[in-house]
Every structure is written in structure tokens, then in C-alpha cells.
């Protein structure tokens, strides 16, 4: 048993090392938004030294999108505090990315292990999720760290859905798990939060018997209350910020959006070379972002179609299985991510302008495709192992991991070979990036009574939830002991 646990650990280490290859240098890759992120860390460090905590990223509204103004700075305390100790800016940035990627590996493995108890399939699924070209490009190619953070925490939402659909109970109550998932996304990236909410809504409709029954509504209600209370300290200034910049948000939301969507070609291309933009209208695929779900997931999808149409796979979808719902949500994600989807027509409406102004491109919906196809692939490998011999199943699994590994090596090596280093030896070396101050997001001793009141409510709410969970857990333990004694 101990040996099996050790093998799982070393497999996760291998997955991490393969995807984190660009971080094992002594410099930062000069990617699209790296200068902005470095200035963000330095700016946050300076404010902390002055006794001010910036709750969200300052925004330059001249950029293509306004998502930065809604991305929380809570997790950015880690690099900022490390920077205050005297560590170099490049090292704290790379360490932050190491932490993000490690969290992605651990949380995705946890979610997949819950849905697929076989460790081997869960590990392969973890590799497929963590080695997705979209994610690697987001981390290293574009350096959209907010989106990468959201992607790292999205498996917590998947874990909630897997348990809810299969009616499993974990150590945490379902309502608390959902509240934690939403909170993590809220503090990471507003755009990924919206994608996560779409995932939740779709699964609630698809699995309405499990998620929208009496117990389901109670779980959702508790999660909403817990999320609002625990994040009131952030949501209150966020609302004030949106009200103050509502006209600008609508203006950003009315800009051309559809032309930055993906081609169907992106889901069929095997080897991608990381670029910097989504400007497909002007550049075609030249120097554009390396987006896609990866050749392994594409191959598994076509293998599934072959098995279905050849009559080999006749299994009907079960409403107790989360794979089918997530697969169809992934198909929706593919549709929404395409440049042929009528986004510009929809964004003529003020509601869609507000909902999508925080998104740089429809490609953000590719996250749903990655999640759906990953669960589909794991479900397919699980079913194939049950129907075929162990040798045939092992060949399929080995082929999947080999294709994913080669494609990942190709992309990470191209990023390393094509990107120049960015050296920051002193503050004067930082690029000239203009940050627009947002007074609504500045927390200091001089903050108003309303803001400090929200902080107090959130603090008491978090403390109350912890105490409640401890009491309930002790009560359940006593009841379990009594039943065993009886």
C-alpha cells in the first residue's frame, strides 16, 4: 500500500516536471504580459510597505480587455511578501508559477481520483489536464497568470460536481466545498469565474435530479450565503468599482470580440508553437497563441467516435456518472470558443457586454472543452479496460500518455528556444507600464467604516463556518461510535 502511494507521488512529480520545464531557468521568458505581471508584484510590494493592501489589480483600460481590474490580489501576496524579503523579482515570479502549477497537478489529481478510483486512469487524466496547450501557453506564452490561477483551482468545482452527481460525501460538506470553489475562482480571475459558473449551471440543468432536488437547492443556497459572507470584504469594493466604471466596462464589452475566437483547426492541430496574441484576423496563425486541448484528447475523441459507430461501445450514459454531462459541457465550450459563434451580435446587448467585458477572447471557453474531454477520455479508458484485455487497455493508455508527453515537450521546448530572457536587476529595469489606481480596492488603516465593517463580517463568517464544521464533525463522530457500539 505504501509502495502504491509512493508510485502515485512520483508520477505526479513527473507530470509536474514535464509541464514546468520553462521554469527551470534563472530568468523569466519575455512573454506577452510578463512585464505587466512583474510591475504588478513590485507595485503591490511598494503599497504593502506603505501599509496599503490592493485587493485587486490596477488596470490600464487602454488594453484590449478589462479583466485585470476584477482579478483579486489575495494570492499575489505570496510573491509580494517574498519580494519584501529581498528576493529578486524574477525568482519570486518563477516561484509563484511553480506554486500555481503544483496546485494544478494536486487538485486535478484529487478531482479525477474521485471520479475514477483507478489510480492509473486518474494520473493519465491529470497529465492531460495539466499538459493542455491552452494552459501551458497561458502560463508561459501569454503569461495571463489570473487565468492560470483560475484554471488551477477549477478542479475544486469539478470535485464538487463529481461528488454531487455520484451522491458521494467527503470530509467537507458539499455546500462548503462549492463555496470554497467559487471563492478561489473569484480571487483568481473573474473571466474564469464566469466560465466556472457556466459549468455549474450546465451541470445543474443536465443533472437536475441530483443537483436541483430539495437537498440540492439547500446545498446551493448555503453555498451562496457562505460565499457572499466570506467574500463581502472583496465583493463590496468590487460592486463600487463596477458602478464607477460601468460606462467603460460597456465600451470594452462592445469592442470586436468574435474575430479573436479559435478555429476548428486549433482542436485538430497536433504541434503548436507559442505566440502572443489572438489576432487571427490580421495574422492568421502567425505568432498567435498556442491554444488547443492537445493531440491526446483529440485522438481519444475520435477513438470514442470510432467505437460508437462501429458498435463496440454500446454503453448508455448513466445519470449517476459525471462523465456524460461534462462531455456535453465540453462540446458547448468548443462551440462558444469558435470565431464563427455570433459573439459580436450577442454583444450588441448590454447584458452580454457586461458579462463578457472581462474576457479577452472567446478562447477562454476552451477551458470547458479541456475539462469535458479530459473526463471523457478517462471514462473511455476505464470502460475500455473493463471490456478489453489488460494488454489492449495498457497499449491504449501508453499511447495516450506518450502522445501527450511528446506534444508537451515540443511546445515547452519551442517556448524556451524562441523567447528571449527578461532580466530585471534593479527597479529602473522594469518596463514603463502605466497602472491606473483604483481607490475602491485599496485597504488600509484609513479605509472607511463600511469597508472595515465588511472585513469584520467576512472574518466572523469564516470563523463561524469553521466552528460549525468542527461541531458537526464531532457530532457525526459520536453518532458513528454509538452505532458501532450498538
What kind of region is each of these model predictions?
Residues 160-184, 214-221, 392:
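Short hydrophobic alpha-helices at membrane interfaces in multi-pass membrane enzymes
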Residues 19-116, 120-153, 184-185, 191:
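Active-site lumenal/periplasmic loops and adjacent helix-entry segments of GT-C-fold
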Residues 219, 224-309, 333, 418-454:
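Periplasmic/ER-lumenal interhelical loops and adjacent helix-loop junctions
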Residues 210-220, 303-344, 388-392:
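Membrane-interface helix-loop-helix junctions at transmembrane boundaries of multi-pass membrane enzymes
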Residues 1-22, 393-402, 462-486:
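Start-transfer (signal-anchor) and selected internal transmembrane alpha helices
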Residues 41-42, 148-167, 181, 199-200, ...:
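Specific aromatic-rich, kink-prone transmembrane helix
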Residues 85, 135-149, 251-258, 332-372, ...:
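Membrane-helix boundary/interfacial segments in multi-pass membrane proteins
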Residues 229, 291-319, 326-327, 331-332, ...:
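Hydrophobic, aromatic-rich transmembrane alpha-helices
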Amino acid at each position: 500500500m505504501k509502495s502504491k502511494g509512493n508510485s502515485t507521488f512520483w508520477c505526479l512529480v513527473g507530470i509536474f516536471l514535464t509541464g514546468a520545464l520553462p521554469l527551470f531557468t534563472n530568468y523569466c521568458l519575455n512573454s506577452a504580459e510578463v512585464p505587466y505581471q512583474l510591475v504588478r508584484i513590485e507595485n503591490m510590494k511598494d503599497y504593502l510597505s506603505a501599509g496599503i493592501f490592493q485587493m485587486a489589480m490596477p488596470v490600464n483600460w487602454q488594453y484590449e480587455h478589462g479583466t485585470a481590474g476584477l482579478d483579486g490580489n489575495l494570492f499575489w501576496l505570496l510573491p509580494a511578501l517574498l519580494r519584501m524579503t529581498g528576493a529578486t523579482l524574477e525568482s519570486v515570479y518563477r516561484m509563484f508559477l511553480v506554486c500555481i502549477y503544483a496546485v494544478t497537478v494536486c487538485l486535478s489529481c484529487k478531482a479525477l481520483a474521485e471520479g475514477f478510483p483507478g489510480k492509473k486512469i486518474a494520473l493519465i487524466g491529470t497529465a492531460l489536464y495539466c499538459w493542455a496547450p491552452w494552459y501551458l501557453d497561458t502560463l508561459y506564452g501569454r503569461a495571463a497568470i489570473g487565468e492560470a490561477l483560475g484554471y488551477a483551482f477549477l478542479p475544486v468545482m469539478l470535485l464538487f460536481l463529481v461528488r454531487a452527481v455520484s451522491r458521494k460525501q467527503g470530509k467537507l460538506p458539499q455546500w462548503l466545498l462549492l463555496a470554497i470553489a467559487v471563492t478561489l475562482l473569484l480571487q483568481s480571475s473573474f473571466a474564469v469565474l464566469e466560465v466556472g459558473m457556466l459549468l455549474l449551471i450546465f451541470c445543474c440543468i443536465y443533472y437536475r435530479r441530483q443537483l436541483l432536488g430539495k437537498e440540492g437547492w439547500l446545498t446551493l443556497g448555503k453555498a451562496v450565503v457562505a460565499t457572499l459572507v466570506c467574500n463581502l470584504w472583496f465583493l463590496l469594493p468590487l460592486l463600487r468599482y463596477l458602478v464607477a466604471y460601468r460606462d467603460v466596462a460597456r465600451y470594452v464589452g462592445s469592442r470586436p470580440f468574435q474575430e479573436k475566437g479559435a478555429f476548428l483547426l486549433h482542436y485538430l492541430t497536433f504541434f503548436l508553437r507559442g505566440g502572443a496574441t489572438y489576432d487571427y484576423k490580421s495574422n492568421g496563425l502567425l505568432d498567435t497563441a498556442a491554444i488547443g486541448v492537445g493531440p491526446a484528447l483529440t485522438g481519444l475523441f475520435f477513438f470514442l467516435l470510432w467505437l460508437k459507430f462501429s458498435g463496440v461501445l454500446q454503453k448508455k450514459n448513466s445519470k449517476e456518472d459525471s462523465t456524460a454531462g461534462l462531455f456535453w459541457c465540453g462540446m458547448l465550450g468548443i462551440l462558444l470558443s469558435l470565431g464563427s459563434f455570433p459573439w459580436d451580435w450577442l454583444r450588441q446587448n448590454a447584458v452580454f457586454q457586461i458579462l463578457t467585458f472581462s474576457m479577452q477572447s472567446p478562447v477562454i471557453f476552451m477551458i470547458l472543452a479541456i475539462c469535458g474531454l479530459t473526463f471523457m477520455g478517462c471514462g473511455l479508458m476505464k470502460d475500455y479496460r473493463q471490456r478489453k484485455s489488460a494488454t489492449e487497455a495498457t497499449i491504449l493508455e501508453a499511447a495516450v500518455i506518450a502522445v501527450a508527453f511528446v506534444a508537451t515537450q515540443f511546445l515547452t521546448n519551442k517556448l524556451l528556444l524562441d523567447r528571449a530572457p527578461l532580466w530585471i536587476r534593479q527597479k529602473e529595469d522594469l518596463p514603463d507600464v502605466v497602472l491606473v489606481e483604483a481607490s475602491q480596492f485599496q485597504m488600509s488603516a484609513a479605509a472607511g467604516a463600511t469597508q472595515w465593517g465588511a472585513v469584520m463580517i467576512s472574518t466572523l463568517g469564516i470563523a463561524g463556518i469553521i466552528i460549525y464544521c468542527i461541531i458537526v464533525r464531532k457530532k457525526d463522530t459520536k453518532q458513528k461510535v454509538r452505532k458501532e457500539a450498538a
